[in-house]
Amino acid sequence: MNLEAQAKKAAISFRREHRLGLQPLGDLVALIEQTTGHDVAIIDADPDEHGLTMHDPDREVTFIGIARTPHPMRQRSTLAHELAHVLFEDWNSQTEFGSRSPQEIRADAFARHLLLPEDGLRELLGNRKSLSTADLSAVVQSFLVSPAIAAIALCECQYIDVSIKKQWMAINTLQLATQFGWKDQYESLQDGSNRSRAPQHLLARAISGYREGVVTAQAIATLKGGSVENAVEELSKAGITPSPLEIPRVSAADLPPVTVDLSCLDIDQPENPT
């Protein structure tokens, strides 16, 4: 089975296993955390860094870090790409300089099939024989994928030929959103993808510790990537305040009786030993 077939099979299996049907996927961060149990964080990173999956085999812990970006469709592709590495357990893959490993190629294909399943595309477009950029826009807006991913899928499903695919792959999402009237939605997506985001399970544990008075507001603020003041205000509005640490006080009357044996002091000591 080639890489494309492996990726498609895994994407179909993932959707089936988690009863996702053919519909567009919503919050991918929450989806990955809930289905895999792994922590996912949206973090600051260099412009050339998109995502990274780290795995500790000794503790069986996996962490996925994704760069925050004003390009929401790219971020969704990166999230799906890193999910592929988790599902295929690509922990030890090595890439030669200047080339892309088979694992990376397979992860790209998985992301495309997961985000835009062929049957879902056919369900949206039906038996149309001729498509326009308005149809491309509808696919991009519905499934929240890049025009490049949409164009590849449309070509694979034989809605368009290779020449149109190449033309449409050069279009960016902002162009489509502006032309077809959903720029406001796109800007809302940009706001979400360009914001830091702490792993939900880790943040929940930290907030629980804050409530118990053993985790500081600074720790919460660091996780959320904001100020201490904002963290405290946000928690207070939710009715979450730290419990004061109560140090038990014990009075002398509460202490148990202590018996001291002083009999050894009564032993006569020899005088002027020689």
Model features per residue range: what roles?
Residues 1-274:
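Active-site hotspot residues in diverse enzymes, especially metal/ion-binding acidic/histidine motifs
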